[in-house]
Regions:
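Non-catalytic substrate-recognition and accessory regions of acyl/acetyltransferase enzymes
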Residues: 1-126, 133-155, 159, 164-191
Length: 191
């Protein structure tokens, strides 16, 4: 298990860090199974942060930072606000998903938190930094927002294999049984 520190990207950008060093660390992040994670970190994380569209949290290898002075992204997650379309859900599914939410049967959409990205660098094993640890850090960040603005629904989109291997075991349920046009399941979880 590695020693790590979770640092919101916004805090790094607001301080006098060398943005080129941060961008270089992003380029060194590798996730061969989900190259979307690599692309997002390199191309979109900073613009999303600057526009407040989504907030990225970096899980930094603290030992490499202290001992080698090297900024290494071991994992990261991005969270955002979202509105999810529930107009096609049955009344039963809405009740199951929303419980006693006021006016739930007539709602067409509902606010939620979105995990837009969540992943670990290939340089780290699941024993060094587990998916559960990353997810727990994500839950913690969302819980801070939920205490301020409310909300109790979490959404994530994932490939079929990740639903079977990870998210189903973590209590996520399919919003729709079929895959989207992009080949993704939309999953939800109450928080």
């Amino acid at each position: 298990m590695i020693n790590y520190k979770v640092i919101p990207l916004g805090e790094i950008l607001n301080k006098e860090y060398d943005v080129q060093l941060i961008e270089q660390a992003f380029k060194e992040f590798s996730c061969q199974r989900e190259t979307d994670l690599e692309n997002f970190l390199i191309q979109k994380a900073i613009p999303y942060e600057k526009t407040n569209y989504g907030k990225t949290h970096l899980i930094i290898d603290e030992d490499k930072l202290k001992n080698e002075g090297k900024f290494v992204v071991a994992a990261y997650f991005t969270i955002a606000q979202n509105s999810i379309d529930i107009s096609q859900l049955s009344g039963k599914k809405k009740r199951k998903m929303l419980g006693a939410y006021p006016g739930r049967d007539s709602l067409n959409s509902i606010p939620s938190y979105l995990i837009g990205q969540l992943g670990r660098c290939d340089a780290y094993s699941g024993k060094e930094l587990s998916g559960q640890q990353i997810l727990d850090e994500c839950y913690h960040a969302i819980s801070i927002a939920a205490r301020v603005v409310g909300g109790n629904l979490l959404i994530v989109e994932c490939r079929e294999c990740m639903y079977d291997k990870f998210y189903e075991k973590k209590g996520f349920k399919k919003l729709y049984d079929e895959l989207s046009d992009e080949g993704l399941y939309t999953l939800y979880q109450k928080i």
